[in-house]
């Protein structure tokens, strides 16, 4: 509480004024704050600064031929940030240090940078020091979750881009984190997705977006009209380990940042936390508002079989 008070004091002293009219809503991970005047709502600031943010680290031991992830680890750090805040929402009774221990910069931590690097190489042939994309990041989270049953959160990654299959999900125990790695355009987000993307922030199960700009990932947690608020991992602190923990202050951001929707990169990961059957039914009911971003089907289509009868003889080309 004292740390958050210091952050608020620091921010309110330097804060730009809010330019949106009174009555405008800020949507923050499924709930809202109403703008009353030119100032940001204090509860919104407090909740923003209370979020866990995991950034670049230096002095890391155990990484192959390197001691820092600065310059290449932002997608991993932003994905860790999404996962850490998801766990905090799911288990509010857990102490912050318990959650941070899962992401410690040491090989034994379940979701450490070491584990992501190892899994990235195993699953996607991504070498240490190479940038992760959304699909690689999601695949790593799912596999690491499977390998750590003591972490009380299951992960389901959408298939075929953005598809959730009910029969597959029914085999996963709650609570479950749904991760949807997708692309909403070519060089920028296609305007046809704007309304649905804005709607996602109003869904109660929404736990954030990882993405941002090409090779510069962030964690997005709130929006005001078409501006998105985000946490930025591009700040380097010294490594956090269980024996030498970093200052708690390095896991919170004292700066409010936002970017316009048209400036976002179209590649991103959507995260939704489903804690029980009731929340799943609520998610299904609301999916119609962002049906082009997340699709739900009963089961995955069977692959089409190819028979020899349909294979052209190589000599046919001579007669065409």
Swiss-Prot record:
A GO BP term here is:
mitophagy
Citing just one GO molecular function, the answer is:
cysteine-type endopeptidase activity
Entry keyword Iron: no
Name the catalysed reactions: [protein]-C-terminal L-amino acid-glycyl-phosphatidylethanolamide + H2O = [protein]-C-terminal L-amino acid-glycine + a 1,2-diacyl-sn-glycero-3-phosphoethanolamine
This protein's superkingdom? Eukaryota
Q: What happens when the gene is disrupted?
A: Impairs atg8-processing.
The active site consists of 74 (nucleophile), 232, 234
Localization, UniProt: Cytoplasm; Nucleus; Preautophagosomal structure
**E.C. number(s) listed in UniProt:** 3.4.22.-
The record's top EC class is hydrolase
- One GO CC term on file: cytosol
Reply yes or no: does the keyword Cell cycle apply. no
Output the InterPro entries linked to this UniProt entry: Papain-like_cys_pep_sf (IPR038765), Peptidase_C54 (IPR005078), Peptidase_C54_cat (IPR046792)
UniProtKB keywords? Autophagy, Cytoplasm, Hydrolase, Nucleus, Protease, Protein transport, Thiol protease, Transport, Ubl conjugation pathway
Q: What's the family? A: Belongs to the peptidase C54 family.
State its role.
Answer: Cysteine protease that plays a key role in cytoplasm to vacuole transport (Cvt) and autophagy by mediating both proteolytic activation and delipidation of atg8. Required for selective autophagic degradation of the nucleus (nucleophagy) as well as for mitophagy which contributes to regulate mitochondrial quantity and quality by eliminating the mitochondria to a basal level to fulfill cellular energy requirements and preventing excess ROS production. The protease activity is required for proteolytic activation of atg8: cleaves the C-terminal amino acid of atg8 to reveal a C-terminal glycine.
Record's protein name:
Probable cysteine protease atg4
Species whose genome carries this gene: Schizosaccharomyces pombe (strain 972 / ATCC 24843) (Fission yeast)
Q: Which gene encodes it?
A: atg4
């Amino acid at each position: 509480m004292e740390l958050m008070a210091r952050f608020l004091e620091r921010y309110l002293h330097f804060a730009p004024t809010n330019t949106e009219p009174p009555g405008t809503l800020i949507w923050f991970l499924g709930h809202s704050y109403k703008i009353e005047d030119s100032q940001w709502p204090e509860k919104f600031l407090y909740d923003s600064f209370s979020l866990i943010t995991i950034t670049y680290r230096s002095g890391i031991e155990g990484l192959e031929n390197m001691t820092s992830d600065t310059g290449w680890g932002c997608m991993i750090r932003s994905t860790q940030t999404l996962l850490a805040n998801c766990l905090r929402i799911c288990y509010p009774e857990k102490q912050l240090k318990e959650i941070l221990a899962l992401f410690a910069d040491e090989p034994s931590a379940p979701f450490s940078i070491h584990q992501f690097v190892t899994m990235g190489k195993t699953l996607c042939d991504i070498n240490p020091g190479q940038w992760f994309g959304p699909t690689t990041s999601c695949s790593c989270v799912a596999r690491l979750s499977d390998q750590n049953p003591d972490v009380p959160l299951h992960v389901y990654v959408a298939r075929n881009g953005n598809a959730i299959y009910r029969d597959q999900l029914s085999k996963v125990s709650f609570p479950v984190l749904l991760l949807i790695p997708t692309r909403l355009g070519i060089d920028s987000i296609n305007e046809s997705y704007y309304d649905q993307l804005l709607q996602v922030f109003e869904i109660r199960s929404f736990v954030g977006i990882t993405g941002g700009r090409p090779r510069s990932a962030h964690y997005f947690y709130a929006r005001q009209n078409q501006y998105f608020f985000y946490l930025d991992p591009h700040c380097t602190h010294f490594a956090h380990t269980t024996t030498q923990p970093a200052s708690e202050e390095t896991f919170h951001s004292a700066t409010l940042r936002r970017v316009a929707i048209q400036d976002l990169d179209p590649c991103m990961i959507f995260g939704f936390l489903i804690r029980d059957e009731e929340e799943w039914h609520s998610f299904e009911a609301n999916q119609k508002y962002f049906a082009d971003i997340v699709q739900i089907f009963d089961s995955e289509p069977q692959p089409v079989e190819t028979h020899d009868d349909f294979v052209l003889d190589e000599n046919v080309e001579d007669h065409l």
